[in-house]
């Protein structure tokens, strides 16, 4: 007879009011290096992925404990001058270093860039596509003399055979406008009347890396994508609920706007409106702050590289004018999108290693602390500095050596639970500290029984309960207080209760 044992962990995760760093892990790779590192809150190494090819910029941990990373594939097929951290290939890597799947995106006209994000189980890549000077001039670009590489996104779904398939794409080229030549496509009489489109002439310069999109994030609740452009000094939101055909048009999707820009912020002069340029130069790593009750949940957050001065960066929070009733970002006629300035700001200490003029990343932890990864840039050997500050700006964790773009994962992230059996060190983190308690013992009035269990468990909580296996796959979701587990294999499971931030492990 099989037995499924439940162990309640006396671990209550709450919003902390005292000044302390948040427990969890940091994931990073050094640009140009072959190894990705996972360290715990005490800066001890917990796991590494050692690969035969170098990482370029971004690595992320999936809920199943696997790593997703960009790497440099056959980039020689594309004229890559001035491409920062070129890519051409993306991989999903198992904890033991084996390649689950790999996908090459590099040919004479396209190449993946250095950033990516997860869309559920899929991977969204930033990429370039080549446009000749002839194509540029035909589209209304002013006197193009060389090729440009406008941004596009491709979403990949693993095909189960070691590769992946493109299931969705969006191209900035489909959403350009110009006001210089009425005889050419995409002509508009007034750029400021069309903030949903990108002025093809708003950026000049000789580099093919025209916009340099360097950060991308996905919001599952809104089904939207946000991305940042270093050279435009601006961030943008687009609709992801579209088909690829709708994404190439101006209608369709939840927004009804197809692939047009839903929201933009940081530099109103890009669409010919007056207003403060809150992003004076480079910007990196725009992302949504998780909206789960943590401070400023639902805001956007950016690493504003020169937000304070040329030598001092800022982590800015932006409360967007999203309206739930109309499902739109509100904007007054003739005015730029609000807010007129940042909503929240943490001013990084001036100079290296706490500020950075390029690359870099940030995140907001569930206790309100801000995680910062200031890159030392290409000249810094692909490394950077990671640290965590509280609401007063006091450094509570770090500084410690990191990479160009790090990610912080808290103890209850399913990918951390799935990765635990593969970690070389679990004793120096509090994430896995647990004292088993017998059946009918309580944690904050919560009771689970019987323990061990064979076919049913009872939990005296009416909230939604989700049970995950050790690979981070959800196997049960129910609001019932009595749960049938007879169909589950023996093993360790993680139970998450939606209306309570309490973590349990079921054995």
Per-region residue spans from a language model:
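C-terminal outer-membrane/trafficking sorting elements
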Residues: 41, 439-507
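N-terminal signal peptide c-region/cleavage motif recognized by signal peptidases
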Residues: 14-16
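In a subset of proteins, long, contiguous C-terminal domains/tails are tracked
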Residues: 2, 403-432, 471-473, 487-507
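Sec-dependent signal peptide recognition
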Residues: 2-9
């Amino acid at each position: 007879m099989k037995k499924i044992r439940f162990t309640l962990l006396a671990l209550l995760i709450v919003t902390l009011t005292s000044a302390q760093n948040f427990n969890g892990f940091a994931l990073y790779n050094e640009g140009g290096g072959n190894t990705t590192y996972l360290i715990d809150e005490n800066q001890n190494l917990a796991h590494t992925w050692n690969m035969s090819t170098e990482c370029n910029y971004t690595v992320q941990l999936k809920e199943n404990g696997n790593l997703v990373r960009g790497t440099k594939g056959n980039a020689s097929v594309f004229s890559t001058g001035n491409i920062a951290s070129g890519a051409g290939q993306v991989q999903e890597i198992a904890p033991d270093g084996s390649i689950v799947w790999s996908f090459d995106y590099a040919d004479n006209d396209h190449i993946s860039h250095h950033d990516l994000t997860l869309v559920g189980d899929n991977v969204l890549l930033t990429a370039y596509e080549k446009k000749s000077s002839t194509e540029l001039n035909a589209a209304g670009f002013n006197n193009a003399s060389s090729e440009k590489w406008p941004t596009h996104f491709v979403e990949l779904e693993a095909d189960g055979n070691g590769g992946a398939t493109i299931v969705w794409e969006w191209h900035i080229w489909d959403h350009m406008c110009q006001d210089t030549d009425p005889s050419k496509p995409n002509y508009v009489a007034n750029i400021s009347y069309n903030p949903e489109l990108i002025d093809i002439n708003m950026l000049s310069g000789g580099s093919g890396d025209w916009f340099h999109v360097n950060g991308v994030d996905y919001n599952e609740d809104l089904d939207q994508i946000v991305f940042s452009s270093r050279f435009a000094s601006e961030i943008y939101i687009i609709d992801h609920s579209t088909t690829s055909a709708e994404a190439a048009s101006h209608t369709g999707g939840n927004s009804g706007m197809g692939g047009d820009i839903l929201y933009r912020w940081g530099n109103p002069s890009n669409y010919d409106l007056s207003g403060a340029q809150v992003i004076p130069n480079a910007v990196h790593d725009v992302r949504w702050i998780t909206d789960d009750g943590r401070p400023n949940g639902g805001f956007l957050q950016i690493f504003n590289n020169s937000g304070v001065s040329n030598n001092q960066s800022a982590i800015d929070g932006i409360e967007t004018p999203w309206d739930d009733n109309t499902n739109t970002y509100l904007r007054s006629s003739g005015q730029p999108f609000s807010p007129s300035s940042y909503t929240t700001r943490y001013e990084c200490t001036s100079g290296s290693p706490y500020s950075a003029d390029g690359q870099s990343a940030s995140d907001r932890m569930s206790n309100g602390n801000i995680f910062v990864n200031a890159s030392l840039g290409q000249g810094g050997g692909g490394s950077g500095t990671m640290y965590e500050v509280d609401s007063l700006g006091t450094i509570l964790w770090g500084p410690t050596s990191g990479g160009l773009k790090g990610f912080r994962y808290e103890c209850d992230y399913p990918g951390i639970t799935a990765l635990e059996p593969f970690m070389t060190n679990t004793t120096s983190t509090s994430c896995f500290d647990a004292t088993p308690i017998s059946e009918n013992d309580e944690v904050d009035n919560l009771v689970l029984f019987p323990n061990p269990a064979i076919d049913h468990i009872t939990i005296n909580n009416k909230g939604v309960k989700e049970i995950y296996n050790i690979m981070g796959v959800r196997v049960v979701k129910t609001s019932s207080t009595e749960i049938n587990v007879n169909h589950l294999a023996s093993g360790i499971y993680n139970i998450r209760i939606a209306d309570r931030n309490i973590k349990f492990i079921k054995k």
